[in-house]
Design a protein with these regions (language model features):
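A "functional boundary" signal
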Residues: 17-342
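Sec-dependent N-terminal signal peptides
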Residues: 4-13
Length: 342
């Protein structure tokens, strides 16, 4: 159960903002064939990788971007190519590959100055330490990252370091310290800073306060996340589909809040709202959360047969996806609930 909570908390914010559309990718690939080997071509490759980031084509195009960027001595795009490799391997929990690309990325970033991306990459690496229960190593590395960010006056690095500290504390059952670190990350967020970073921190805060049964704080952060999302989509309407998973998350955790405060009908309305964001491309963890909240709703109104059916669906998805994609044993709340109804 502990590792499942960590997976939920650490995965938010890493797959944001890019709709995976074959049409957009095909159009850019056609354009790529006609472009000269200059920065325009590098920019187009970069755009293709963002679309293809969740499949193996990401690695193929990132390799091409790295080779062509190095040939042109373009440290910016070489740094980004390393970052995309890191993100791909992080999402597959491949610790050695992440470590290899951190080593390759750092000297490139020292030339390009893309420290925000580097600190994001370090966050991936440290969160994998936490996920594999190397908590003291994660805390030590997060403190090193915090000092490095302080030395070069990088806000993104400071925020990421506190996020990592929070995850490590929570993983080792130091919940109060974890919440304190996460609230420090929240305090450090610039008022008009990167919306994706704010969404990531708020999502973690919502997850943690829900697990701690702190309903008042959970509602506060849910309302802020909703406001941030709405403003971001108004300013960037073309990215709405790419943020569908975050909308699902927000509606599901509103439902948790209302179930925890004995308001099942309001919870149900948010579960229904979340349904419209589900697609075949929805990240599997969000699908699990969707079916799990339905089970909890039916438990709350004592319709145990329906609850059991949704728990079965949740268990099937966990067995199929988590053991395959994350190499995890199945120890979940859904399993405990299923035993209760058996």
């Amino acid at each position: 159960m502990k590792r499942l909570i960590l997976l939920i908390i650490t995965c938010y914010g890493l797959l944001l903002g890019y709709a995976n559309t074959d049409t957009a990718s095909d159009s850019l690939l056609q354009m790529l064939q006609t472009l000269p080997h200059d920065t325009t071509r590098l920019s187009t490759l970069n755009a293709i990788i963002k679309i293809e980031q969740n499949n193996y084509k990401c690695i193929q195009y990132s390799d091409t971007l790295m080779l062509e960027a190095l040939k042109l001595k373009n440290d910016k795009y070489a740094s980004l190519a390393a970052y995309y490799h890191l993100l791909y391997y992080y999402n597959r929990c491949e610790q050695d590959s992440v470590a290899k690309w951190i080593v390759k990325m750092e000297p490139l970033v020292q030339k390009s100055g893309l420290w925000d991306y580097f600190f994001d990459a370090r966050r991936f690496q440290i969160d994998l330490y936490t996920f594999t229960e190397q908590y003291e190593l994660a805390i030590s590395e997060a403190n090193k990252m915090k000092q490095k960010a302080l030395d070069i006056d990088n806000n993104r690095g400071m925020v990421a370091a506190y996020q990592c500290l929070s995850n490590a504390y929570i993983g080792s059952q130091r919940w109060d310290e974890g919440l304190k670190a996460l609230e420090e990350a929240y305090r450090l967020l610039p008022k008009n800073g990167n919306a994706v970073v704010r969404i990531s921190v708020l999502s973690q805060l919502i997850s943690v306060t829900k697990e701690m049964k702190d309903n008042n704080r959970q509602l506060k952060y849910l309302q802020e996340l909703e406001n941030v999302l709405c403003k971001f989509i108004i300013d960037n309407p073309s990215l709405k589909d790419g943020f569908a998973d975050v909308f699902i998350f927000n509606e599901i955790f509103y439902a948790h809040y209302y179930l925890n405060t004995d308001q099942p009908q309001l919870a149900y309305s948010h579960i229904e709202k979340s349904k419209k964001y589900l697609t075949e491309n929805t990240y599997f963890m969000y699908k699990v959360l969707y079916y799990d909240i339905y089970a909890k709703y039916y438990q709350s109104i004592k319709q145990y047969q329906q609850a059991s059916a949704y728990i079965d669906t949740t268990l099937t998805m966990l067995k199929k996806d988590m053991t395959r994609n994350w190499n995890l044993p199945l120890h979940s709340e859904a399993f405990e609930n299923k035993r209760r109804f058996s």
